[in-house]
């Protein structure tokens, strides 16, 4: 299993705080998919949920980005430890971002009250969140075997 878009379209970067259309970046009208991104993410519930997380992030001196990446590593359904083959796809625009993201991915589990805030935030945004998967999820083969079958 792989997590794509762990920063919720960049909302966990902390740069976007409201549904006001930015002048630059993926959410702007200058970007060819800006409108699609805004349709997916620019909802009142999304920004309300982010504010819940920001409060606990400040309390623990954590960045929103760090919270997102550490949650993926330690609190999601991913199996990354002890030989697990799951992962997180991260996008970066500089070597410094890559190094910072990798350091955050290597840090330990989040404090309990951060997890509680994330759970609360999910309950706030869940009713208006767009589902990524658009079709029925039906496999006609053993996915584990197809992906991880030992080579002869």
Residue ranges and their predicted role:
Residues 1-30, 56, 63:
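Aromatic-lined glycan-binding groove of carbohydrate-active enzymes
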Residues 1-2, 87-89:
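Structural preference for beta-strand elements that scaffold enzyme active sites
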Residues 25-55, 59, 74-78, 82-83, ...:
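Terminal-tail/helix-coil boundary detector
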Residues 67:
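Glycine/threonine-rich phosphate-binding loop and adjacent beta-strand/alpha-helix elements that clamp
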Residues 64, 85-87:
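Active-site lining segments that contact anionic ligands and/or coordinate catalytic metals
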């Amino acid at each position: 299993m792989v997590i794509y878009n762990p920063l919720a379209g960049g909302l966990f970067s902390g740069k976007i705080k409201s549904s006001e259309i930015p002048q630059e970046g993926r959410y702007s009208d200058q970007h060819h998919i800006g409108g699609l991104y805004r349709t997916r993410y620019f909802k009142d519930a999304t920004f309300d949920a982010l504010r819940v997380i920001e409060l606990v992030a400040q309390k623990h001196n954590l960045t929103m980005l760090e919270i997102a990446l550490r949650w993926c590593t330690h609190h999601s359904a991913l199996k990354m430890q002890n030989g697990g083959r799951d992962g997180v796809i991260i996008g970066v625009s500089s070597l410094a971002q890559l190094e910072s993201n990798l350091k955050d991915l290597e840090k330990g589990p989040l404090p309990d009250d951060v997890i509680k805030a994330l759970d609360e935030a999910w309950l706030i945004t869940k009713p208006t969140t767009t589902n990524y998967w658009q079709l029925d999820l039906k496999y006609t083969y053993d996915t584990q075997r197809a992906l991880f079958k030992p080579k002869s």
